[in-house]
Amino acid sequence: MTNYKLIDDFLEKNLEKSINELSWLVTQPSVGAQNLGMKECAELVAEILTARGFSSEIQATGGAPVVFGERKGKSNKTLLFYNHYDVQPPEPLELWDTPPFEPSLREGKLFARGVSDDKGHITSRLFAIDALLAQGELPCNVKFVIEGEEETASEHLHEFIRDNKAKLKADACIWEFGGVDHRDVPMQYLGLRGICYVELSVETLGTDVHSGLSGSILPNAAWRLTWALSTLKGPDERIRIPGFYDNIIPPTARDREIMDALPDVADEYKRRFGAKGFIKGLTGGIDLKMAASATRLAISRYTASARTSPA
């Protein structure tokens, strides 16, 4: 039987060791969008798995490699962890108080690119495994899948899954992150929304045009795109794409009951995002919580460019 007091004591006693391991891991750049340091970081991840008695391997894909690790436990049950070692680009660098790949411990917090997303979750899970191993065998088989393309839409993960179905068999899987809410209470997520990303492109002319000369007689791409986007959603916040809501499963009474039991987030959202209020006159309570988890449509970025034909 697991002795949770011994686990807590181990974690407290070895916290500095875990922070040092995380610091070592985030020192290695692994910027997926720039293909920077991916192979090197995969090797480090495999190394820290091997150091804990995991059989680990690095599998090549059409992009960044995937690290797979496995260690047997006392039971025939298997728990699978998913994580990723790639990080977002650190730019703009001038907004950093310290270099992004030089970890800095300030006021009890570690700052570096990847500390939160997602290298800290890799090392914290392994830290928990250390605490269990200090008491003997693991209670179940444990597997890790740690990829390097999460920040770039996991383009080749499906290939890895297709080719390794037998290896990936498990009784349960824990996804990449966890955390605490604004009260520092640990949160357990039961699911997340998926995403469908669509890129719209409009081109109306073959060359750049001076607005003062021909802007009144030639079609403008920016306006065409603006008009198109304005048809997607109305002032009432309802999405106007035909069939968009057809297969969405509405929340059950039990879903609402669970959400209602969670603390109100209105003041925290205003503070965190600098918002004065919410859409549709929402002020808080269960309606705001349900709206925050509802299906949505967002415009994430505009990019405009003009090109001039060569002379």
Predicted segment positions?
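Acidic/His- and Gly-rich active-site-bordering loop/insert found
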Residues: 2-115, 132-138
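Generic secondary-structure signature for well-ordered alpha-helical cores
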Residues: 16, 27, 31, 50, ...
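Short, glycine-/Ser/Thr-/acidic-enriched flexible segments
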Residues: 86, 179-181, 205-207, 302-307
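Short small-residue beta-strand/loop micro-motif enriched in glycine and branched aliphatics
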Residues: 110-112, 206-212
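Acidic/histidine-rich catalytic neighborhood of metal-dependent amide-processing enzymes
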Residues: 116-191
